[in-house]
């Protein structure tokens, strides 16, 4: 019995201890729930607050069941906290909102929906289109055109060079027999014969000859077509043009008389009459036919006087003109040659241009652009015509009446020129006088000595008074003569 009572006492003691422990567990659970409910008012309780569960270290195996119960109670309390937070969020969503607080909010466009309305479409480009030659047709055309231009430049330049050399080879013997110096390039101080053409550019070649009686010199200019220019080649297909040889002979003043004369195609003479200063002033009439002298219909004559035409159109000259009429563009003899008309922006020039006694020949190379080196030999008789014309101009002289008429024509041209430029010359003289007065005043003002400055002013004043007195005397003399 004592053992039984003792066993009952132990049971009671053990029960009281376990009951006390259970009460402590419930109190701690209430504390945890109280703390969680306090922080459940915030919506971001899961992000900001970190709940820490009370942990107990139970060393005995008998307390494992109690620890399990404690953890289960803690999980239930956390679930309760989440449910409270959800209910609070639901309450805030169900609450009515104030329209004035969100004024203008609905007016904002929803850009996110508009961006998603038009989807981006990607087109698949076939790979064979990118690698095809058709994609580079523009580059191919440009390269082809560039190669064609370069090839044409080389071929055209070489052809002009061959034509020039062929002309020089066929005329060299004749030129060296009539001139001491052939081919001076002007680079040396002393005249030296180089015996070759001087290339000005790809289509113009020059040759200077001198050392002959009755002339200062002769300049030969071979004006070939611009065969090196592809555009010029294409333009010539629609309008053929011929190569030309231009020869300019400068005569001595004492070896040529005073006259102006020209013969050539009617079209060329009309152009020269319009462009050249001497032909427009001394040969104002229209070109006349040369049938009277046996010239073909393709050639016409411009002459200052009939005596000049009669003297120049001898048998040999007519022979040259008739047999080589297809190669002759123009022949121009003038003692008043000054080149093309001078056009100035501010009106007429104040003085007559300088003149030279000149013989000017322009010949067309046969072939109308399709010229070959062998065609240059056909121009040799025309060079003989030039040599003959030099001697003819030296021998020809006007009679006394013709000389007087020529002098009157030149005086008339000079008088007309002075009338046209009278106003301009007066303005130029007035500007020179004003400039002189201005310089005199500046010299007086820059004088530092007052006494010397006063004397200079008095001298200038006396000069002005003398000029006024001279003008008054001239006016009185004019009035007396008028009476």
Curated annotation (Swiss-Prot):
The subcellular localization recorded is: Endoplasmic reticulum membrane; Rough endoplasmic reticulum membrane
Q: Where is this region: Disordered?
A: 46-119, 424-483
Compositional bias (Acidic residues) spans? 60-104
* Lumenal membrane side: 157-483
Q: Name one GO molecular function term.
A: calcium ion binding
Q: Which residues form a coiled coil?
A: 450-483
One term under GO cellular component: multi-pass translocon complex
- The record lists glycosylation at 178
- Tissue-specific expression: In the embryo, expressed in the endodermal layer of the yolk sac and in the small intestine.
First-listed, main subcellular location of the protein, grouped into a coarse class:
endoplasmic reticulum
Phenotype seen when the gene is deleted: CCDC47 knockout leads to embryonic lethality at mid-gestation, between 10.5 and 11.5 dpc. Mutant embryos at 8.5-10.5 dpc reveal several anomalies including vascular abnormalities in yolk sacs, developmental retardation, atrophic neural tubes, dilated left ventricles, poorly developed myocardium, and paucity of blood cells in the dorsal aorta. Yolk sac endoderm cells show alterations associated with endoplasmic reticulum stress, including lipid droplet accumulation, endoplasmic reticulum fragmentation and dissociation of ribosomes.
Q: Where are the transmembrane segments?
A: 136-156
User: What ranges are annotated Cytoplasmic (topological domains)?
Assistant: 21-135
PANTHER family under this entry?
Answer: ADIPOCYTE-SPECIFIC PROTEIN 4-RELATED, PAT COMPLEX SUBUNIT CCDC47
Provide the assembly information: Component of the PAT complex, composed of WDR83OS/Asterix and CCDC47. The PAT complex is part of the multi-pass translocon (MPT) complex, composed of three subcomplexes, the GEL complex (composed of RAB5IF/OPTI and TMCO1), the BOS complex (composed of NCLN/Nicalin, NOMO1 and TMEM147) and the PAT complex (composed of WDR83OS/Asterix and CCDC47). The MPT complex associates with the SEC61 complex. Interacts with VCP, HSPA5, DERL1, DERL2 and SELENOS.
Q: What does the protein in this record do?
A: Component of the multi-pass translocon (MPT) complex that mediates insertion of multi-pass membrane proteins into the lipid bilayer of membranes. The MPT complex takes over after the SEC61 complex: following membrane insertion of the first few transmembrane segments of proteins by the SEC61 complex, the MPT complex occludes the lateral gate of the SEC61 complex to promote insertion of subsequent transmembrane regions.
Official protein name in the record: PAT complex subunit CCDC47
Task: State the organism of origin.
Answer: Mus musculus (Mouse)
